[in-house]
């Protein structure tokens, strides 16, 4: 490369670094008593530290020990962030929604996926989120989800016939992702053609791989690939929405898309295409990443722990024996899966499918003796409580009994958030996990082929080799 170009690039890097250093110092000087911590490298923040840490859990705990067990500052995804820790931090964030804090999503997620609305501002994301919550809470109530259980069971059976039964060895993670996304396409959009599902799922891989990265849009970066994938998802999903609106009178399905099209607010206003798109996207992201990760690690622990598998098998076989030939699962069957759900919760405690969630400070406030300025982003982390021996004795031990009775103390087990921002898809995820567990456990025993498989962390934890197992049919 030409020496002049190299010199120019070096000079530009130094200039940009100094700009961000002085800009950060000036901004920080306006507030006293900020949370302790580090902003890391200019532009990159502590993203490199996070990436080279063996896990997000280690990253969080090292800084809790070094700075504060209640709140510390860092810089991730191009933002100054206050990480709230422990039960007090969780309670504070969950209790101050729309008082001190409001919804915020990283640009690396919103730009590739969110559809611009008429107002086209960060506020539009917040408005959509509020609409999303109210609408989704209604349609995702347990009484409204009952109708989905037979469909989930039927699709799980078909999935096993095609992807599991013909083989002696399978990779769990990619198969579960395929199942959960196909199920979402069927229930949300009434799409069951494999080729049509693939037109959505392939670009989704690009989007989810770049969702929580530094938003640098240069060729070859994860963020750049996410934007390209997002454009393909947007084009395909918008085409589906417009076609459904045209043919809605002849459509007799009661899927999510139909409900979104017919939904109106208290003023009689219907959603526009962008709002419909954004609501669907939220559920597709959750079903593709977090739920599939949860199911994967439930099966991982069932493969590793024969005693746990046997107890789940007993419970599920009691249900199976009560069913007629070909009879599908129903709501009453799900309610009997108490031990199975305790097992799922313990797997989620040890290997949370989502790390936490972001908020934005809408005013200056204090917590733990520190000031969090307006405009800063906040984050609550599952890793600050899920393995705390104060709340979970012998935290590395797999013990489903922790969830018997009233279960863990409030604000200690938080994979679905809490307060007004409790994940509205929690019940949907519970049904999906339990239905899949039932179909696996009543059909197969699992043997891991890579005993100490490495776990890598993206938006969710991922087994490096896809969790390959040998499957043994149960007679």
From Swiss-Prot:
GO terms for molecular function: heme binding; iron ion binding; monooxygenase activity; oxidoreductase activity, acting on paired donors, with incorporation or reduction of molecular oxygen, reduced flavin or flavoprotein as one donor, and incorporation of one atom of oxygen. CDD domains: CYP90-like. Its cofactor is heme. It is found in: Membrane. Specifically expressed in roots. Its main location: membrane. SUPFAM superfamilies: Cytochrome P450 (SSF48264). The chain crosses the membrane at residues 6-22. It catalyses: beta-amyrin + reduced [NADPH--hemoprotein reductase] + O2 = daturadiol + oxidized [NADPH--hemoprotein reductase] + H2O + H(+). Keywords: Heme, Iron, Membrane, Metal-binding, Monooxygenase, Oxidoreductase, Transmembrane, Transmembrane helix. Its EC number is 1.14.14.64. GO terms for cellular component: membrane. Heme binds at residue 423. PROSITE patterns: CYTOCHROME_P450. InterPro entries: Cyt_P450 (IPR001128), Cyt_P450_CS (IPR017972), Cyt_P450_E_grp-I (IPR002401), Cyt_P450_sf (IPR036396). It is an enzyme of class 1 (oxidoreductase). Belongs to the cytochrome P450 family. This is Beta-amyrin 6-beta-monooxygenase.
